[in-house]
Swiss-Prot record:
Residues 1-21 are annotated as: Disordered. GO terms for cellular component: cytosolic large ribosomal subunit. This is Large ribosomal subunit protein bL27. HAMAP family: Ribosomal_bL27. Pfam families: Ribosomal_L27. The gene is rpmA. GO terms for molecular function: structural constituent of ribosome. It comes from Paraburkholderia xenovorans (strain LB400). One of its GO terms (biological process) is translation. Keywords: Ribonucleoprotein, Ribosomal protein. Belongs to the bacterial ribosomal protein bL27 family.
Length: 87
C-alpha cells in the first residue's frame, strides 16, 4: 500500500500586520483641518503651530493650510507646523 508519512508542524509562520506609520502629508503640501500629517510611535516629531497631537502621538492639522517641517533648539527637535492658507 502507498502511504505518505505525516508532515511536521511548525510553531513559526506568523507576522504582525504592518501599522502604516510615517509621514502622510509632506512639506509644502496643502492640508485641511483634521487631516493626519504624521503617524508615529512616540514623539519622533513634535507639534508646532496649528498642529495637534492625538493620544497615540499622531500629528494632525488644526487649521487649513500648508505643511511645514523645521527643527528647533540645540537638540534639533523635529517640529511640524501648518501655515494657514491666505484668505
Amino acid at each position: 500500500m502507498a502511504h505518505k508519512k505525516a508532515g511536521g508542524s511548525s510553531r513559526n509562520g506568523r507576522d504582525s500586520e504592518s501599522k502604516r506609520l510615517g509621514v502622510k502629508v509632506y512639506g509644502g503640501q496643502a492640508i485641511n483641518a483634521g487631516g493626519i500629517i504624521v503617524r508615529q510611535r512616540g514623539t519622533r516629531m513634535h507639534p508646532g503651530e496649528n498642529v495637534g497631537m492625538g493620544k497615540d502621538h499622531t500629528l494632525f492639522a488644526l487649521t487649513d493650510g500648508h505643511v511645514n517641517f523645521s527643527t528647533k533648539g540645540a537638540a534639533k527637535k523635529h517640529m511640524v507646523n501648518v501655515v494657514p492658507a491666505a484668505v
